[in-house]
Amino acid sequence: MTVDNRCSNSSLCLRNVTPKQHPARVCSNHWQLKNLISTQNTGEESNPIYYTNSVFVWKIYPNSEKVVQVGQGLSFKPLSLLGKCGYIAAGGQLGEFDYWSPTSKQTHMKLCDQHNNGIEIHRRNCDSHAEALISSNDHTIKVVDLEHGLLRKQLHFPVNMNHASVSNDGRFMVCVGDSPQVFFYEIDRSGEYHLRHTTVADTTDSSFCTSISQRNELFAVASQDSSLSVFDVRYLRTPMLTKTSSRPDPNGSIRSCHFTPPNGGPLDLLLYSEGFSYSHLLDLRTGKDVELVLPSEDRFFSPASQDIFGSCFADDGSSVYVASATHLYEWNIDKRSRICFPSYQLL
């Protein structure tokens, strides 16, 4: 099913139509890789948003607008960034992979000589150890044991790989690369990966991001040809829903997608962002979405030409954040309304 309906009543999801602005200079070092902000629960009074600028990783606390540098400067300009499971990790153009542990220890690894396009972090069910999945241009996903700083194994593919996501229960993984193919892996009790299905997103182009829903029922694939494919894990042959962005590629290429985080409660939302100016908040109960448009930052340029360098939910699902070159924009979710009327049958 392909739909392109827009929800005219933003109050279905949002408390504010005009976003708050926070000072954060975010930059991308690759025109296709624009998934460069992230957050996680740190146990602090408010959780930071991580972002990259040049060879540095920063974190901003939106409540106070305090900005802090994470660790030392890197030896590379990051293409990928993620904060999860207590870790913060960044990947580079020549196989570099740096991460900070929960104790702030910084580790540097050289994994290959190709781009590290995407990072996923999860804890294994077998021993609760944290491991990273790094999607690379050498046709592999590398599995790194973050507890010991060791490359544990490599999964091999027929194309450059761009992104992977692990389900919240740790039982399966989906990944995508420079083709329409979507690879579905089972993760067994010992932590090993087994390819179970290969399906195709509703695209003829490369895909750059994946996300798995809160209850592990759905997963989404964001593609370069301006399409977003949503699959039901029980029916992998074809997508159950396809959304198209507001414009054709390259401006309308979808560069990131994120389901409501596990700590957010039953909000049933999916955030996805184009490469320029427009993000969308999809209501999974109705299939309708709300456009989130970046405000004009420069009177000499069209608002439709502003780069988006990443988007994410707050860890508790209370807000969504979208990053431009100069600001982090925040829209607040109407959580009370969403949770008061939850849905147990999506779409």
From Swiss-Prot:
* Cellular component, GO annotation: cytosol; nucleus
Q: Which residues form a coiled coil?
A: none
**What keywords are assigned to this protein?**
Cytoplasm, Nucleus
Compartment(s) of residence:
Cytoplasm; Nucleus
The principal localisation class reads cytoplasm
Keyword Iron on this protein?
no
Give the InterPro entries listed for this entry. Answer: DUF2415, WD40/YVTN_repeat-like_dom_sf
Protein name stated in the entry: Uncharacterized protein C4G3.03
Question: What is the protein's species of origin?
Answer: Schizosaccharomyces pombe (strain 972 / ATCC 24843) (Fission yeast)
What lineage does the source organism belong to? Eukaryota, Fungi, Dikarya, Ascomycota, Taphrinomycotina
